[in-house]
């Protein structure tokens, strides 16, 4: 195992410390229990959005705390769900009187612990469950489809609505619409190593790829030989299109996400291939996102997410955002403490 580590037991704390120092103009990190919140308290009467999950997927979720997205994020240990007391403490810290909306990826541990945290919290709250992965219906960590990269899109789009006065009910309704109209497929060329384990999550040959891999290294649809990028991308899109069934000329957002170990040069190549394929099918790409947003430590691979867009979705996607990992449409001054 080759990683920047001092002591495995201190890995998460040191990482969170560094994150807090690097982005002290936007966020603050709270310990015991661990959660990340906005530096400036949410304005009164705004719905507060809280997400979280196991660490190792950065910048999801802590990198999306800030104006136009999340109010707080709860990081668990690497690939492990956060504990209910984290969600309770985060909610108590950021609730501004309009209620709390928890955004939860569909993994058994996450759902159980977020549900317990919501029950422990005495304030008004509700939840969205994301399950955009079209690869498999059931997996090692889930009953039903896994929640993966489209969670980022939910957090951005719902975050805008919440920032602009949407009610708890309206925010949940929009989040469910985004989730329902999203589909994701991932491919891995390599495994990844959880620091506490010290060895790869799974074994894979140098000439093999896992088609439909999960963000914790869960098995996908099949293991096969690596093929040319256009073939891989076409197969990924076929799976997504079979699920979403977009209409010809329907507006979409195309999101190419890196798993952590794949360079941007390759991600843009994937995006180019995807654009050509979707154009040939008469599908309009009106918005795009390319980069490492929902990762799996150092895994080499990528996922493709397609989101069918209406005017409400596009309006909230385009709205200003300022977080550690996603920012546009705002002029800000920086003050590091």
Q: What would you call each of these model-derived segments?
A:
Residues 2-42, 52-56, 60-64:
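N-terminal, Lys/Arg-enriched amphipathic/low-complexity engagement segments
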Residues 57, 64-66, 70-96:
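Glycine-rich oxoanion-binding loops at beta->alpha junctions
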Residues 111-124, 266-272:
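Short Gly/Thr/Asp-enriched flexible loops that form oxyanion-binding sites at enzyme active sites
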Residues 128-181:
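Short alpha-helices
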Residues 164-269:
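Mixed-charge interfacial surface used for oligomerization/domain docking
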Residues 259-276, 296-309:
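Short glycine/threonine-rich loop-to-helix capping motif typified by GTGT followed
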Residues 290-322:
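C-terminal edge-of-domain segments
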Residues 335-336:
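Conserved small/polar residues in nucleotide/adenosyl-binding loops
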């Amino acid at each position: 195992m080759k990683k920047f580590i001092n002591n495995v037991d201190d890995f998460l704390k040191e990482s969170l410390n560094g994150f807090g120092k690097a982005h002290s103009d936007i966020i603050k990190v709270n310990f015991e229990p661990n959660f990340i919140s906005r530096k400036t308290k949410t304005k009164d009467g705004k719905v507060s959005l809280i997400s979280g999950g196991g660490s190792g997927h950065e910048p999801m979720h802590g990198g999306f705390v800030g104006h136009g997205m999340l109010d707080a994020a709860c990081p668990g240990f690497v690939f492990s769900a956060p504990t209910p007391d984290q969600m309770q403490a985060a909610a108590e810290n950021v609730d501004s009187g309009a209620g709390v909306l928890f955004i939860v990826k569909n993994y058994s541990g996450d759902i159980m612990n977020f549900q317990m945290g919501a029950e422990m919290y005495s304030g008004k709250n509700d939840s969205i469950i994301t399950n955009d992965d079209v690869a498999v219906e059931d997996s090692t960590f889930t009953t039903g489809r896994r929640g993966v990269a489209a969670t980022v899109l939910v957090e951005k789009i719902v975050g805008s609505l919440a920032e602009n006065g949407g009610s708890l009910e309206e925010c949940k309704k929009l989040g469910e619409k985004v989730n329902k109209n999203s589909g994701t497929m991932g491919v891995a060329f390599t495994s990844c190593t959880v620091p506490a384990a010290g060895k790869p999550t799974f074994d894979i040959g140098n000439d093999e790829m896992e088609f439909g891999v999960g963000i914790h290294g869960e098995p996908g649809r099949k293991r096969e030989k690596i093929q040319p990028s256009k073939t891989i991308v076409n197969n990924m899109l076929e799976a997504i299109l079979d699920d979403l069934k977009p209409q010809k000329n329907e507006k979409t957002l195309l999101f190419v996400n890196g798993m952590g170990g794949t360079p941007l040069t390759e991600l843009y190549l994937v995006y180019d291939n995807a654009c050509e394929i979707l154009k040939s099918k008469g599908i309009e790409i009106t918005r795009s996102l390319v980069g490492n947003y929902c990762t799996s430590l150092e895994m080499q691979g990528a996922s493709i997410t397609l989101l069918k867009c209406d005017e409400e979705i596009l309006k909230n996607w385009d709205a200003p955002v300022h977080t550690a990992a996603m920012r546009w449409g705002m002029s800000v001054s920086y003050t590091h403490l």
